[in-house]
A protein has these predicted regions:
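Active-site-proximal beta-alpha core segment in soluble small-molecule metabolic enzymes
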Residues: 2-3, 7-10, 17-18, 31-189
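Conserved PLP-enzyme active-site core in the AAT-like
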Residues: 26
Length: 189
């Protein structure tokens, strides 16, 4: 019979901190940094990584509401953004825990606005643009622009930002990533 061994990872939080500090040095002064710590910080421990990066990260990005709630319950006060889809039944908890979500349809924005009004609060959202990932997000066209303008007028929403997801950033050839960035930049101007 073969011997089986448990696999484990030894996470060097100091190295993570140093990597983020060095990455931030490459940005322009005043640039804000959102640490993406979805999927338990990719298996590194979301709460531990968030606490380690508290002095360098301006916000945290997660995949689902439950990950954001875990951060809040661990005492993380900085802004948290759900990068993906948040189901309608979870809007009240999202608003109560002061967690922002990606918005990518008029209907979604309107439903969040209604829930925020019921709670007497403003819901925080970020506009998600689809520049080439082809999953979720507003396209760069006149119809989307008009919808985003309508969303901006909703009384119980606070639009905190706008973002996109680069489809092939890990590839050596950055042609597609540059094209996505140009689409993004062109639309938000």
């Amino acid at each position: 019979m073969r011997d089986y061994y448990r696999v484990y990872a030894n996470i060097d939080l100091d190295a993570i901190h140093e990597n983020v500090v060095n990455a931030k040095k490459l940005t322009k002064p005043g640039t804000k940094l959102m640490a993406i710590i979805k999927a338990d910080a990719y298996g590194h421990g979301a709460v531990e990584v968030a606490k380690t990066l508290d002095d360098v990260a301006d916000a945290y990005g997660v995949a689902i509401l439950e990950e954001g709630i875990e951060l809040r319950q661990a005492g993380i006060q900085k802004p948290v953004l759900i990068l993906g889809y948040t189901p309608k039944p979870l809007y009240p908890a999202m608003i109560q825990y002061d967690i922002a979500t990606a918005v990518f349809t008029w209907e979604m924005a309107k439903e969040i606005d209604v829930e925020a009004a019921k709670l007497g609060k403003k819901a925080k959202v970020h506009i998600k643009l689809d520049t080439g990932m082809s999953r979720i997000g507003f396209r760069q066209d006149e119809e989307s622009f008009e919808m985003i303008c309508r969303i901006a007028k909703l009384e119980n929403l606070s639009i905190e930002g706008c973002f996109t997801h680069f489809a092939r950033m890990d590839e050596t050839d950055k042609t597609w990533a540059r094209k996505q960035f140009q689409r993004y930049e062109s639309f938000v101007k």
